[in-house]
Amino acid sequence: MALVRSIFSAKKILGGSLARTSKAPKGFLAVYVGENQEKKQRYFVPVSYLKQPSFQALLSKCEEEFGFDHPMGGLTICCPEYTFISITSRIQ
């Protein structure tokens, strides 16, 4: 439950223009989530998520369908935001 709160808190923090230019905190990586290029949300996720099978599966699916070469310049996960939140909320 704390993870869900931290993800939602991160989303709140990232809502402002300052968040668009700030670097990811140490131990985190910025990802852009969403199906629509104009409506992608930026999230900071712990680097440890990269070891989690469910997160790896999400990345693999996105790579197969869309590739990772996107104009956003960061790691882009092309899935609905609710899917991303659902998967990351189960990672502990």
Curated annotation (Swiss-Prot):
Membrane topology note: Peripheral membrane protein
Gene induction: Accumulates in response to sirtinol (a small molecule that activates many auxin-inducible genes and responses) and auxin. Expressed in the dark. PIF4-dependent regulation by temperature. In low thermo-responsive cultivars (e.g. Col-0), higher expression at 28 degrees Celsius than at 22 degrees Celsius in petioles but not in leaf blades. In high thermo-responsive cultivars (e.g. cv. Alst-1 and cv. Ang-0) higher expression at 28 degrees Celsius than at 22 degrees Celsius in both petioles and leaf blades.
Lineage: Eukaryota, Viridiplantae, Streptophyta, Embryophyta, Tracheophyta
Protein family membership: Belongs to the ARG7 family.
Listed name of the protein: Auxin-responsive protein SAUR28
A biological process term (GO) from this entry: response to auxin
Cross-referenced Pfam families: Auxin_inducible (PF02519)
Database matches in InterPro entries: SAUR_fam
Keyword Cell membrane applies: yes
Tissue: Higher expression in thermo-responsive cultivars (e.g. cv. Alst-1, cv. Ang-0 and cv. Com-0) than in low thermo-responsive cultivars (e.g. cv. Dja-1, cv. El-0 and cv. Kon).
Functional description taken from the UniProt entry: Functions as a positive effector of cell expansion through modulation of auxin transport. Involved in thermo-responsiveness of plant architecture. Enhances plasma membrane H(+)-ATPase.
GO annotations of cellular component type: plasma membrane
Phenotype of null mutants: Reduced rosette weight and area at 22 degrees Celsius but not at 28 degrees Celsius.
Keywords of the record: Auxin signaling pathway, Cell membrane, Developmental protein, Growth regulation, Membrane
Subcellular location field: Cell membrane
Other comment: Exhibits a high natural sequence polymorphism between cultivars, thus conferring thermo-adaptation to environmental conditions.
